[in-house]
């Protein structure tokens, strides 16, 4: 995990990947549990956002300006 973002009492992990099709890694699962993350967002170079797993969203790099919205 590259960044822990606290927003309105929520714990959000941010992971940046170069892969076109990111996967949920064991270290991401550990971070979700150990850091009690409400959500993990994976930033990638693709074009469409999608849900990878419960509480895990994959987000295009072009959507970074909207992360706080």
Q: Which residues does each predicted region cover?
A:
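A cross-kingdom feature that marks ATP-driven nucleic-acid transaction machinery
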Residues: 1-69
